[in-house]
């Protein structure tokens, strides 16, 4: 386990991101870069939350990686997986019905981002009730995914 409850993988990712934002190589980043850095690590702080962090942590000058780790351990809140899934499904569910077409889901999951192989998708979709209209209720799908 890494520092302050962060996993070694998280610390490694944070170090990599920190170094990318440390453009002049002095080992420090400006408080103004905190938001974009947190977002690059999966956080989604609002401007108000960032202002609050900067004020409560007295971030008035550039800070080093150890200080950054302390900040992340205290303040980085990644979106829960179920919320990420729900947000993704809502993009497909333009009418807000709670259902998405299996064909649309197949297209996206086998052709965009970290692609699933078509046979992987077929295995996945077997675990969900598909209606006679070719649609699935995505809350059921999310519940199955989160339970695994």
Swiss-Prot record:
One Pfam family hit: EF-hand_7
Entry-linked SMART domains: EFh
Keyword Repeat: yes
Keyword Lipid biosynthesis attributed: no
CDD domains reported for this sequence: EFh
Keyword terms: Calcium, Metal-binding, Repeat
Function: Potential calcium sensor.
Name of the molecule in the record: Probable calcium-binding protein CML13
